[in-house]
Amino acid sequence: MNKLLQCHQVSKIYREGEFETEVLKGVDFELEQGELVAIVGTSGSGKSTLLHILGALDDATHGEVAFLDYQLSALSGNKQAQVRNQHLGFIYQFHHLLADFTAVENVAMPLLIGGKSPKQAKLAAEALLEKVGLQHRMHHRPSELSGGERQRVAIARALVNKPALVLADEPTGNLDHKTALQIYDLMRELNRESGTAFLVVTHDNELAAKMDRILYMQDGVLASDNR
């Protein structure tokens, strides 16, 4: 398998006046193309901070992240935004759908931002919503959808640009257990079909066990890597 992402000695220090808090401490790991990986650990262990750095949403204080052919820290802000739009997908505990837009409009948005025509964007969004089982709900707004349906829309939006990697931060945290299992099964199915890699932060050990590999974070350190 080919290396998709390489994280080398990544540290993150937050400074406020003369006080420093080291949130990440020399994190090292690699992610292969098409892998399905969970990151687990207690609250405050650095999981979400690591995900933000891997997604070029924040900068490491020390260390390097290589993604595809890019050294993320060497890119301009505009180039980082382009990489996020074209090669990365994001899913969060809260769906972050735009309330005034329908499901299909929300899913089409990244394509429109990336320069696709409205017709191309709509067709691609409709195809993905059908794939996640929402063909009958695509013209509904988020307020008209259940929690599980909203998260399916968020997953479709994350995948619409056919990213190499999806970063998911507690994607089932607001869902009941049955719906959470359905969302994880959907992510695994889409992973098999598209070859998109998933890196998922979760507190749920049962759901993490469904992944190909589990990374354990503790006090800002990658404590173990179980394949």
From Swiss-Prot:
One of its GO terms (molecular function) is ATP binding. Residues 5-227 form the ABC transporter domain. ATP binds at residues 41-48. GO terms for cellular component: plasma membrane. It is a peripheral membrane protein. Keywords: ATP-binding, Cell inner membrane, Cell membrane, Membrane, Nucleotide-binding, Translocase, Transport. Its EC number is 7.6.2.-. It is an enzyme of class 7 (translocase). One of its GO terms (biological process) is lipoprotein localization to membrane. Belongs to the ABC transporter superfamily. Lipoprotein translocase (TC 3.A.1.125) family. The complex is composed of two ATP-binding proteins (LolD) and two transmembrane proteins (LolC and LolE). This is Lipoprotein-releasing system ATP-binding protein LolD. It comes from Vibrio vulnificus (strain YJ016).
